[in-house]
């Protein structure tokens, strides 16, 4: 009974926040740090603002390594993260995510790997997504991704694609889909595209998707998401079946956004 009351209150609050949107000051940050924003239809802009409001209400931000957490940081991260949600009309906003840790620059980390698993080898990182409800980002990578929104590299899109992938408890490149019938098409398309991608990378051929996607299916989904939102025309031309599958999943067509 208590669980039901808490859940109902959460749903009601999200609806209220979605309807209210964000302040003019926050929208100015949004427009400045998310190049596609001005090209979005009015309804999509309103939906994005609503998700940003929910995101900033529910998620905690923590500065690391001397990074100050300002509205610029919070809104910029939330805007890019919530771009992944605007077509899907989710009732929740990254439900398993609790905290976003932000470093000023790339950072060296060991212990936990990109999916929260133990990994003793320290490495320099731009960001991480943990299954324990944490995303880690470097602020200079966030701003770099915002400035160059057509290069196919965006740490926020990448790590939050991992969050979507991890919602079902597994980081395997297969996020929760709309219906059971969708999984067959997804598996056939993504597995075939992944195999084809591995062959091109092995032959050192140029690819629209970052070569890091060859690491495993989870990284392929994350890097394909970056290409889908940032290089949609190229991805559709080179990998039309993959583009259509991602378009069905995200319920948007970034080719229509001119910026």
Give the predicted meaning of each segment.
Residues 42-43, 67-73, 211-219:
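Structural motif
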Residues 46-109:
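Extended cationic-aromatic binding surfaces that line active-site or macromolecule-binding grooves
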Residues 2-24:
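Transmembrane-cytosolic junction motif
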Residues 9-10, 26-31, 56, 200-204, ...:
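Short acidic (Asp/Glu) and glycine-rich catalytic loops that position anionic groups and cofactors
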Residues 78-94, 102-150, 170-259:
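Metalloprotease/metallohydrolase-associated module, dominated by Zn2+-dependent proteases
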Residues 18-58:
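Amphipathic alpha-helical packing elements
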Residues 41, 151-167, 222:
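Active-site recognition of the HExxH zinc-binding catalytic motif
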């Amino acid at each position: 009974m208590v669980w039901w009351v808490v859940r109902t209150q959460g749903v009601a609050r999200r609806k209220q926040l979605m309807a209210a949107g964000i302040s003019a000051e926050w929208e100015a940050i949004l427009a400045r740090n998310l190049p596609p924003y001005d090209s979005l239809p009015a309804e999509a802009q309103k939906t994005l603002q609503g998700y940003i409001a929910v995101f900033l209400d529910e998620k905690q931000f923590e500065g690391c390594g001397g990074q100050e957490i300002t509205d610029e940081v919070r809104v910029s991260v939330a805007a890019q993260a919530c771009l992944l949600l605007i077509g899907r009309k989710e009732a929740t906003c990254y439900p398993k995510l609790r905290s976003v840790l932000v470093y000023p620059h790339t950072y060296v980390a060991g212990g936990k790997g990109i999916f929260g698993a133990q990994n003793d080898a320290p490495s320099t990182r731009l960001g991480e997504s943990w299954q324990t409800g944490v995303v880690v980002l470097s602020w200079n990578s966030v701003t770099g991704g915002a400035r160059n929104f057509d290069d196919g590299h965006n740490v926020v899109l990448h790590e939050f694609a991992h969050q979507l992938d991890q919602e079902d408890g597994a980081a395997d490149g297969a996020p929760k889909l709309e219906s059971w019938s969708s999984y067959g098409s997804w598996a056939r398309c993504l597995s075939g595209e992944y195999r084809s991608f591995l062959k091109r990378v092995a032959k050192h051929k140029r690819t629209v998707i970052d070569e890091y996607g060859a690491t495993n299916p989870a990284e392929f989904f994350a890097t394909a998401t970056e290409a889908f939102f940032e290089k949609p025309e190229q991805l559709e031309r080179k990998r039309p079946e993959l583009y259509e599958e991602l378009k069905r999943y995200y319920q948007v067509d970034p080719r229509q956004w001119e910026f």
